[in-house]
Structure formats: structure tokens, C-alpha cells
Amino acid sequence: KALRRGGVGHTQWLKEGDPRKELYDSARAFPLTGNEQVRTGRGRFRVHWSRELAGMMHELALSGSAELNWLTTWQPYCSRVLDPMLGWDPGVERTVIWYDPVTNERRLTGKLAEIMSRVRFERRQEEPLPIVWIDDEECYSTSKTQIESLEPAAPVLMVRPDERIGISRRQWRLICDFLDDSSGFPSVSLDEEGTVRDHAAHVGL
């Protein structure tokens, strides 16, 4: 209902004390200015996104400040659907192949396995790179504990956004600070937006 009435920055219709008023405040969230319907092998889906945030993420990849990898259940549709929609260059962003979209093998375990594999890879490097993992479903304290057990050679930042608004402005500032200098961060840290809600089950595409 909040999205139908304009989403972020359009909260005048909400009563004082309604938690959605703070959640969808433009001081907390990026306005979801992108709104398109996309076709996939699983049907049509309405996608809302922040052009501002997508542009800043792409710029980090273009400048070489970050390696930007898709780790999503949208895996089969990243390069031919999501990248063009967001204005991203598939030659710059990479899609991680982490589950079988036909059999769904590894769908419930593959994301964490890929992150842990990357942590092990960085441990073998002379100049290990820090890792940022953003996921609204799988960045939990239990995952944090498993990653910590690997004793990462460079800091790992786990970010769990509220799925209703995506990465918040505060979380984006944290990510940028981490990318600028991760030396002051713990071995593994988990940031959860204060408004997140627990899912009854794995959602995804």
C-alpha cells in the first residue's frame, strides 16, 4: 500500500506514530525512482529500485573502487534483464553462479557457501581484499559466526537491509566508509537495519 501511494518521501497520508512513516522517510531511505515490469521464465515481476543508489554502486565498479558481484536468486536474469534495466555494464558487474535454476540445488545454502569460499580465497592472497555482503534474507548472526570461524584475512562487512526499502542511507554511508578504510572494522561485522522483519521462509525469486 505504501508503494502504491508513492513510497519513499510520500508519507503525508500516514498518521503520526505509524512506523511506516519513519521507514519510508526520505531521510532514511533512497526514493525508489525506478519502476518497471520485467519478464522472466517464472513470469512477470514488478521491480522497484533507486536510480540514485544503483548509479553510485555502478560508479564504484567503474572506478575500480569495488568489484561488484550479483549473488541473487535472479541469477539467470542478471546480465540480460537486471543490468540493462539498472543501466549497469555486464562487462563490469559479474554474476556469481551459485545455484542450479533448474533443479534448485544449493538454492538454500549456496550464498553462504560462496561467501565462505571467497573468504578462503582471500586468505591465500598476499594482499587480501575486504568483502561486503549485502542480503536481506541471509545476513544473520548464525552466518556471521560461520564466517568468523574461518578467521578472515581481511574484514568482512555483512549488511542486512529492510526488504521494503532496500539499502538505507545510513547503511550506504557505512558501506562507503568500509570501502574507504576497513582497517578499523572487526574481522566480521553484521549491520541490520533496525526495521527488518523476519521471514517465515526463504523468499527470493
Feature annotation, model-predicted:
Residues 1-103:
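Alpha-helical substrate-recognition element adjacent to the catalytic core
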Residues 64, 77-205:
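C-terminal cap/substrate-recognition subdomain and adjoining C-terminal extension
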